[in-house]
Amino acid sequence: MRALRRLIQGRILLLTICAAGIGGTFQFGYNLSIINAPTLHIQEFTNETWQARTGEPLPDHLVLLMWSLIVSLYPLGGLFGALLAGPLAITLGRKKSLLVNNIFVVSAAILFGFSRKAGSFEMIMLGRLLVGVNAGVSMNIQPMYLGESAPKELRGAVAMSSAIFTALGIVMGQVVGLRELLGGPQAWPLLLASCLVPGALQLASLPLLPESPRYLLIDCGDTEACLAALRRLRGSGDLAGELEELEEERAACQGCRARRPWELFQHRALRRQVTSLVVLGSAMELCGNDSVYAYASSVFRKAGVPEAKIQYAIIGTGSCELLTAVVSCVVIERVGRRVLLIGGYSLMTCWGSIFTVALCLQSSFPWTLYLAMACIFAFILSFGIGPAGVTGILATELFDQMARPAACMVCGALMWIMLILVGLGFPFIMEALSHFLYVPFLGVCVCGAIYTGLFLPETKGKTFQEISKELHRLNFPRRAQGPTWRSLEVIQSTEL
């Protein structure tokens, strides 16, 4: 609680979190969820547009194909954005990268807003690709920016705010997409274009806030700018100790250049970090949480929830993830990262198993549908308290300043690739396994919990230098000398 009070007292840091989040991971969650409400309206618009051009309506299977393209272009854009994030973070800095990233949102909002008037569903497709690029960049750079700007005792909580804004974006998108608001047949272009609002808020607020002190000192070599940023972020406290830590980290990175993504896989000194990033990053996307959202509507419908009320029940699922993200942010610096990950995956295994049994027994015992409905909420709560937020800060905490942008690129690209694969494969898994569709996902949850327990070191309350030393000891258990991956040549550039 002392750390939480310090966060509240550090008003500039709190404002930085809000400004980065509203135009960052909030956009990811918001654009992920708002596309669900106008599904039928956009399909009708696509069919009508095609008929106006050719004189013939589109066959049903082609309408579905067009819709699948509109949905799938979002994660594809996210993949491009993730690959763009590393070079942007190094060339422009963390803060400027987030600001420049809004170009994609503004362009997409214009395309969405005028798509119906122009009679072009292609504008919707291009807009979805652009908001995907925006999400891919922000999902990587925001945790990096906030993790580098926070003091070590608040680093986990501050970085976890990315998960809070993602969940908040999902809920806000579900609310704005209600039929009573912008989810109607006439307002859907405004619904899609509403992503401009959080982008405008970030453009108005983030320029007034400081850049990452670590970037200013280690990448730019500007001690005065670093000290000025620290003074604004920390207030009137003593900065000597933190500045000394930053100087030590700068000395450790002296003579090094920024790592390229493929170089992370070539060095034994980064073996455990990269393995943890790949295993736990894949587990977060393959654990079945996104599939729970996809399956929720049918479970609520079978449980007797009126069709008109299902949209409100879906908002409840998003609210669960938001609630647990807030709880996780509060407790992460008390219980640590490992406990949240192990506990989250273990609880997901438990609730997923009960959910599978409930689906199998629904024909014999109708009341098990209510049990399945409860398991959906419990599964989402368990995901939100652990994997949803903690996984996102691994790239920031496990890698040093020179490897961090490349690690974020790898983590982000992996996340979007897995999201695409799950989106493509889930319908076939559902058809092939029926009520047992969650068995593969449960296996992933078990593996995630076991890997965390055996191989992931705790980073709570440690400086980046302390984390690097511990990981070096784990990667080279029989050797005590300094890291072997440092270059002897002094390289001024940090270009990827």
Swiss-Prot record:
It comes from Homo sapiens (Human). It comes from the Eukaryota. The keyword Transport applies. Residues 1-11, 83-97, 150-157, 209-273, 333-338, 386-408, 457-496 are cytoplasmic. Glycans are attached at N47. The chain crosses the membrane at residues 12-32, 62-82, 98-118, 129-149, 158-178, 188-208, 274-294, 312-332, 339-359, 365-385, 409-429, 436-456. Expressed in heart and skeletal muscle. The lineage of its organism: Eukaryota, Metazoa, Chordata, Craniata, Vertebrata. This is Solute carrier family 2, facilitated glucose transporter member 11. Keywords: Cell membrane, Glycoprotein, Membrane, Sugar transport, Transmembrane, Transmembrane helix, Transport.
